[in-house]
Amino acid sequence: MLGMAFLVWRWLMPSMESAAQLSPGWLAATLIRNLVLITIVAGGTHLWLYRFEGQGTALRYDSRPFPKNKRVFLFRDQVRDNVFLSVVSGVVVWTFAECLILHLAATGRISTYEMGEHPVWFVVAVVLIPWWSVLFFSAHHRLLHTEFLYRRVHSWHHRNTNVGPWSGLAMHPVEHVVLFSDVVLLLLVPFHPVHLYFMLLHHGLGAPLSHTGYDALTFGPLRIRVGDFHHQLHHRLVECNYGGVESPVDEMLGTFHDGTPEADARMRDRRRAGAASSSG
């Protein structure tokens, strides 16, 4: 995502002069650019893996077809549901977060700097941003699994027990707002635009890639790791792996699951203990 962040900053970012004004031109151009990006990444990956079956079921976590004619999904179809939520809500919220931060920076309300002004801090921020994103996600994701928020918001995302690229951003609009709100950090600390795009693309394109349903994409001898077995188990079992695999949250909460029978037994024990405490 860092390379893509540099690409967007260098060639696809609106000028600060434009961003200082909330004019329809650059706002629409930003929305269209983000739509193109997600269509290339999520749409292209979906076509390769599921329409053209470019690598069959090799390295696929779950070989079942995506559900159709299921009332739980919009249009009674998982893929159409996922595309609609990703595009109509996900990309709009992503674009809003980007445009808001750029406008605040362009009007001097928050601070930015050139790469040459603070090269050490630029590199430090690049190293820290993935950790910030993982910890922020782990915290808000665990909150989304509280009963009130899960039933009303997060259950939309968990309709997808068997995920594909379009499932990554298929969620309730409220969850989109929460997901992209980790950019609030940039309201507090000076940043370079690359940092903004690194954070946004971590979700906007990273979520589709981590939900491919495959461990890796293969093109002849080339193998590109994209899947996330840790999170795949979360979609299947729900009550485990709330954080990213790098996050200490699940180890701290006792909810880490590595797919082994021993982890299954621990989860069953935890469920029994929870049921006993609820009934008592």
Residue ranges and their predicted role:
Residues M1-A139, L143, R152, N160-S181, ...:
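Non-catalytic, topology-defining segments of multipass membrane proteins
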Residues R10-M13, H158-R159, H203-G204, G220-L222:
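N-terminal start-of-chain detector that recognizes signal peptides
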Residues F136-V163, S210, Y214, V226-E239:
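Acidic (Asp/Glu-rich) catalytic motifs at the cytosolic membrane interface
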